[in-house]
Swiss-Prot record:
Record organism: Gallid herpesvirus 2 (strain Chicken/Md5/ATCC VR-987) (GaHV-2)
Family indicated by similarity: Belongs to the herpesviridae major DNA-binding protein family.
Protein name (Swiss-Prot/TrEMBL): Major DNA-binding protein
Positions of region (Required for nuclear localization): 1166-1191
Superkingdom of this protein's organism: Viruses
Function as written in the Swiss-Prot or TrEMBL entry: Plays several crucial roles in viral infection. Participates in the opening of the viral DNA origin to initiate replication by interacting with the origin-binding protein. May disrupt loops, hairpins and other secondary structures present on ssDNA to reduce and eliminate pausing of viral DNA polymerase at specific sites during elongation. Promotes viral DNA recombination by performing strand-transfer, characterized by the ability to transfer a DNA strand from a linear duplex to a complementary single-stranded DNA circle. Can also catalyze the renaturation of complementary single strands.
Motif Required for filament formation mapped to chain: 841-842
InterPro entries linked: DBP_sf, Viral_ssDBP_head, Viral_ssDNA-bd
Zn finger region (unnamed): 498-511
């Protein structure tokens, strides 16, 4: 939205269209990859994509006709009411969808949704009108004179009016149908208008839409037949209404529809939207734990004033305010266009794939990694189903008695949703029994929890299963012995009863998928306020994700009068990084487009001399750039380099606009649930403020203060987290073409009427800003609670930099000495003739166990150079990550050099990494079960069928699975404007004493679940992750803290092995994998070992070892693999002891020094003014109320 001006022109138009397309022109193969469609229903949800579901010139912003109003006292004239809005990012197929292939073979998903809906107490779908009033798909086809057997019908609807269509308050103007071109085929479309076109001055939902002569009918007007289609209403009830109802905790789903639809017609509504008889889940919130004592709250329903009643009131008011603010967002207009399939690089030019089907399938497997993360994370927004309440001090950061922003908060509690229902007073609803409440302790995952998150929508559930089927079972991250193939085989032979499947469909059953992923699925029970796992997309070109984030940014630098902005930008840290990277690219060490790619360095490093020359050149370039930056900042820009470091943040932004995530119904759903969760978090933070000093139990409290709460939430914009922009909306043409109210809806007569916008200024929610402080504050505020002080003390310990010596293999050049070992030391051989690999060589060398005389003088110099560089880097290093490529090394070295200039000491800085979703062909038989096509009736047939499918994988274009790679160069990933999954906790605070302005900070937090979410993720307080899936180059053009027991996993054990100084760590890791995952090691490839070890060199050695076992006589088996690995270990341990050894320590007697000692040469740095740099440590900045999240 950066490009949106202050004024936008809109054309008046209908509230939606019914598209009628011939089935023969439907690109069914492409739509099958993008659609949400279950196996037991023909209805489907598709993305709104130009060239695929709508025409290429489709206009997504519109001034929609909301009704008419009379003008003048006696003139009898009428004008149109026009409301700015945009089109919903999905379309709804309600007839003829049988031509689209279901996205999963899982049977009976509609039945599963109905059973879960009944279990959790949400209202079931009931027809909003009698069958006699239905406009069937066949009738629509007949009116269009099209063959009903060969037509597919779908709804394209504006965001504001989707609930209006569900409530049958609209009609089809058959006479106004026209023809558009989609995918080189003629497609008919019928405009949809609200009934209020013939009901002037009627500002609410009509409860008698099928009455031929309602009381409000305009003079001379003919009442059209209201549009009601049962399949469409059922689809809207599931995908639109139920998902919102679950997010807002409202069991009466029709109440959601009526509340949202009312706002379409009454733009001045300020009262409540949700009914007073809304029910709530009965549960006891977790009280705070202090001094080791657990103070349990009272039973639900017996809470005194200020307890359960206020929590339920806050829950209802937050839901009501969110529903109203959703209307504000729905009335936004966006410059960013809807997706256009003809501009998707993988669609138009699928380089590297057989065709676009294979390219799309591979990309959707990437997306599966992020969707899986939202399912596997226990703090994902899709599970935020209840409101918790803090104890007496838990929600406060200080001991003051002022109302806390953190008293009420959302919790992930699907395990409580089946509890009995109570009213706002805490009394059980008729027929409910409070004694049947579920314990709030940790609960095992159930398919019903996923169905609840999907809003009981079978189409959405099917699409989620589509993605989960492409996620692995977590064998690398979880220590378990589950063999899904054997489990399914046994279940088929035993004919185990299942409500959803029989023997022939057991391999496809949703329960089978859940069982395969059981070790990755979350457990619930934690009721404390924390970070939420959000989904979004980056559309902004700007973010600060380099090592020092927003340090020395443009807005903080002094600018001389008349000086060009371009000149000032040259003295920013951001441009310094770019300049450094370009200089290194010129030297052939990396490429700026992909700085993790080592191909350029491989071409330039040919021997030891070229290696030393490359490292020395890089060091000189970085120190020169750092010196110049510091000089300019202090002498020209008058920038306080120390305080600036304390203010620096890593920043990125998530777009609010819907179309960036609009390529799939699940992504659109996740984006919407994120907005709902964020708005509710804001609303709940204001509830305790609104309630303070008021009689919350009073009958009219909600009526009086609901509008106050909404206004307070809207005032939180542009205060640190949610950014918005106010624009002026005007009409392209005051004369709007609409159906003549006095004619039949089948008549083609058009009336030109004058239109007026109900509002000319529109508030557009733009972005959610995420921040991560570069420096750890380290201070403990005196007024902080004991719990806060305890947490801060733990953080201080985690950030404290240890004084241990950095190992060469784990140091700054570790990646390089392993990669180029054969070039650096090509002639080094042991006395027994063995050629040591990099690991063995450096372990022996650093232990002074390498036999004397095997290193030449030149080789000694090379090893000493590496050791000196490692020590020099270690002395000034405050980044708790080892570089993995020259791009990492360059950015870390520059950051550490700047930190040295600023005399930074003691604490590690915060670092960030991106986990990038990638796709590959599956090798695990358990993953490919959903793709088996031949009928399975015997358990013994499952394994052979899976193996046969794996053997013929190249013949199946659609079979791909998700995996991840890791990079510390987050900036290069953000240029692809990726989809993002990230943990965020939102802090709220007053700007200064006495101020009523509430500011917020979206703090970069953790995605709960650790390696269950992604095997590359590890818990480290100094390290933050963002999970990404690139969009640019695929579906977008190139633009000009966890509680509980920590399980010991394969990756944990491997990292422990690698931290030990073993001469053959690759063999040790291989043996460990054989012990923990057994025969599955055979299926593991280089990418798998990369995930486990996070070391390319070691991974290549293990992969080679695995191939040696495969090629050995007798083929691969676990015993042979273990024997070969043991031989490797024994050979590495055979150190000659009959002669003198090379004393490596004696080579660097002058290198001893302290960790915080001076290591950067004064002459090299050429500091212009020593007094500028020899300052005291950075002063701590403290505010009266310090949020732990903000540290």
């Amino acid at each position: 939205m950066d490009g949106v001006g202050k004024s936008v022109k809109l054309c008046g138009g209908p509230i939606g269209y019914i598209y009628a397309t011939p089935k023969c022109s439907v690109p069914v193969d492409e739509l099958a990859i993008l659609a949400a469609k279950s196996n037991d229903c023909d209805d489907a949800v598709l993305p709104l994509v130009a060239g695929l579901t709508v025409e290429s010139d489709f206009v997504w912003n519109v001034a929609a006709v909301a009704g008419t109003k009379t003008t003048g006292l006696g003139s009898g004239g009428t004008t149109l009411k026009l409301v700015p809005t945009h089109y919903h990012p999905c379309v709804f197929v309600f007839y003829g969808g049988d031509c689209i292939k279901p996205c999963t073979k899982a049977p009976n998903l509609t039945k599963a949704c109905d059973l879960a809906r009944e279990r959790f107490g949400y209202s079931a779908y009931s027809s909003p009108a009698p069958t006699a009033f239905e406009t069937t798909g066949q009738q629509i086809c007949e009116a269009l004179e099209m063959d009903a057997q060969n037509v597919m019908l779908y709804l394209v609807v504006t965001e504001l009016f989707k609930e209006v269509i569900y409530l049958c308050n609209s009609f089809l103007h058959f006479g106004g149908s026209d023809v558009v071109t989609i995918n080189n085929a003629d497609v008919r479309r019928i405009p949809i208008y609200p009934l209020h076109l013939v009901l002037p001055d009627f500002n609410r939902i009509t409860n008698e839409p099928f009455s031929e002569k309602p009381r409000a009918l305009g003079e001379g007007a003919i009442m059209p037949k209201a549009f009601y289609n049962d399949s469409l209403c059922r689809l809207l009830h599931g995908y639109v209404l139920s998902t919102t109802a679950v997010g807002l905790r409202v069991r009466n789903i029709d109440a959601i529809a009526r509340g949202a639809a009312h706002l379409c017609f009454d733009e001045n509504h300020e009262g409540t939207l949700l009914p007073a008889d809304t029910t709530f889940t009965a549960f006891t919130p977790a009280a705070e734990t202090t001094k080791g004592q657990s103070k349990m709250g009272k039973r639900e329903g017996s809470d005194v004033s200020g307890g359960g009643y206020e929590r339920r009131t806050a829950s209802l008011m937050a839901s009501d305010a969110t529903l109203a603010i959703e209307n504000v967002i729905s009335a936004s207009v966006y410059e960013d266009p809807i997706p256009d399939v003809n501009k998707w690089p993988i669609y138009c030019n699928p380089v590297g794939y057989a065709d676009r089907i294979e390219a799309l399938s591979a990309y959707m497997a990437r997306v599966a990694g992020l969707v899986g993360a939202m399912v596997f994370s226990s703090n994902s927004v899709i599970y935020m189903t209840e409101v918790g309440e803090a104890g007496s001090t838990e929600g406060k950061e200080t001991s003051t008695t002022a109302p806390s922003f953190y008293r009420f908060f959302q919790i992930a509690a699907p395990h409580l949703s089946a509890n009995p229902l109570v009213d706002r007073d805490g009394k059980p609803v008729s027929g409910e029994n409070l004694s049947k409440s579920t314990s709030a302790s940790q609960s095992e995952y159930s398919l019903d929890y996923l169905i609840l998150a999907c809003g009981f929508c079978p189409q959405l559930l099917a699409r989620f299963l589509f993605y989960l089927e492409r996620c692995d079972g977590g064998a690398k991250a979880c220590h378990h012995d589950l063999d899904t193939v054997k489990f399914v085989s046994s279940a088929i032979d035993a004919d185990m009863p299942c409500e959803l499947c029989d023997k022939t469909s057991r391999i496809y059953c949703a329960h089978t998928t859940i069982k395969r992923l059981v070790y990755r699925l979350p457990k619930f029970g934690y009721q404390m306020r924390g970070a939420m796992g959000l989904f979004g997309a980056m559309t902004n070109n700007y973010c600060d994700v380099n090592a020092l984030g927003s340090y020395a940014q443009f807005s903080t630098l002094k600018r001389s009068e008349g000086e060009a902005s371009r000149s000032v930008m040259q003295d920013t840290y951001r441009l310094t990084v770019e300049r450094m990277m370009k200089a290194l690219e010129k030297e052939g060490l990396l490429t700026c487009d992909d700085p993790t790619n080592m191909a350029s360095a491989d071409a330039n490093i040919r021997d030891g001399n070229s290696f030393i020359r490359a490292i020395s050149t890089m060091k000189n370039i970085i120190e020169s750039e750092a010196s110049q930056l510091m000089r300019n900042l202090t002498e020209i820009r008058e920038y306080n380099i120390r305080e600036g470091l304390g203010d620096a943040n890593h920043t990125l932004s998530l777009a609010v606009e819907p179309y960036a995530s609009g390529i799939c119904p699940v992504l659109a759903f996740l984006s919407r649930r994120t907005i709902i969760a964020v708005v509710q978090d804001m609303a709940l933070s204001q509830c305790s403020i609104v309630m303070q000093g008021q009689q919350v139990e009073a009958r009219n409290f909600r009526t009086q203060f609901q509008a106050v709460l909404k206004r307070r939430v809207l005032e939180l914009q542009n205060a640190g987290f949610i950014t918005s922009k106010t624009i002026t909306v005007t009409l392209e043409d005051q004369q709007i073409c609409v159906p003549d109210p006095s004619k039949s809806q089948y008549d083609s007569v058009i009336s030109n009427m004058e239109g007026d916008l109900v509002k000319v200024t529109v508030e557009i929610f733009r972005e959610l800003k995420v921040k991560n402080k570069v420096l750890f504050g380290g201070g403990i505020a005196g007024a902080a609670s004991e719990a806060t002080k305890s947490r801060l003390a733990g953080m201080v310990e985690a950030y404290q930099r240890p004084t241990k010596t950095m190992h060469v293999l784990n140091g700054p050049l570790g990646f390089a000495v392993k990669r180029y070992h054969t070039l650096l030391f090509p002639d080094v051989k042991m006395p027994n003739g063995a050629t040591p690999n990099a690991l063995w060589f450096w372990i022996l060398l650093l232990r002074n166990q390498l036999p004397a005389g095997i290193l030449s003088k030149e080789e000694e110099d090379k090893s000493l150079f590496i050791k000196k560089f490692t020590k020099s880097y270690a002395d000034m290093n405050y980044i708790n990550i080892s570089p993995t490529c020259f791009g990492d090394l360059a950015q870390f070295y520059l950051a550490n050099t700047i930190l040295k200039y600023c005399s930074h000491k003691h604490f590690f800085i915060n670092t960030i990494s991106a986990l990038v979703a990638v796709s590959r062909r599956p090798r695990d038989p358990a993953i490919v079960l959903p793709w088996i096509e031949r009928p399975i009736t015997k358990g013994q047939d499952v394994a052979p069928a899976a193996q046969q499918l794996i053997a013929s994988m190249s013949d199946h274009k659609d079979i791909w699975c998700a995996t991840f790679s890791s990079t510390n160069l987050v900036g290069s990933i953000m240029t692809t404007k990726p989809f993002v999954v990230i943990g965020i906790s939102i802090s709220k605070y007053h700007g200064m004493a006495g101020s009523t302005k509430v500011f917020q900070s979206g703090n970069w937090g953790n995605i709960m679940g650790g390696r269950n979410v992604c095997s590359l993720m590890s818990f480290d307080r100094t390290h933050r992750y963002v999970m990404t899936c690139p969009r640019v180059g695929f579906v977008a053009e190139q633009p000009i803290f966890s509680s509980g027991i920590k399980e010991t996993t394969l990756i944990d054990r491997v990292r422990m092995v690698l931290s030990e100084e073993s001469a053959a760590p690759h063999a040790a890791v291989y043996m460990l994998a054989l012990k923990m995952v057994g025969d599955r090691v055979r299926q593991m490839e280089l990418e798998d070992w990369m995930e486990i070890t996070n070391d390319e060199y070691i991974s290549s050695l293990i992969d080679e070892l695995n191939k040696q076992v495969e090629e050995a006589e007798g083929g691969w088996n676990a015993d042979a693999a273990m024997t070969l690995a043991k031989e490797m270990v024994n050979m590495a341990m055979s150190i000659p002891t009959d002669g003198p050894t090379f004393d490596f320590d004696a080579c660097d007697e002058n290198l001893e020094g302290h960790a915080d000692g001076q290591t950067i040469s004064e002459t090299n740095l050429k500091r212009p003014n020593m007094n500028v740099f020899d300052l005291e440590p950075i002063p701590e900045k403290r505010v009266p109320v310090l949020s732990v999240d903000m540290l």
